[in-house]
Amino acid sequence: MLHTCLIDDNFKQSPADHCVYTKESKQTGKLIVVIWVDDLIIAANNTKSLEQVKTMLSTRFKMKDLGRLKHFLGMDFSQSDGCVKMSQGKYVGKILNRFDMQECRTRETPCD
C-alpha cells in the first residue's frame, strides 16, 4: 500500500535497495523516502516539498511526525549548515566493552 502510494506520487523505487524511494524535479527539488518496517525517514532539499509529502502520506496513513532525525537504527544524527553527521558512538562503546577494549586508540574516519 505504501509502495503504491509513493509510486502514484511519482517516486521511483531504488533498484539497489527496495526500501528507498526518490523523486526529483525542478518543482519538488530532491526528495528521498527510506522505509524500515513501520518507520520512515523523509529527506528533502526544500521545506515546501517535504511538507507536501508529509501531508500526502498523513491523509492516507496514520502517522506521527517526530521532527528532525536524531536517532535511527542505533545511529545518532545531527544536522547543521547543510551537513548531516552520523555517529554510532553508543554502539561502538558497547562493542569495546564487550571485548574489553575501552582503552584502545581512536582514529577518525571521514565519509565522502
Q: Where are these predicted regions, by residue range?
A:
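Long, low-complexity, charge-biased intrinsically disordered regions
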Residues: 1-112
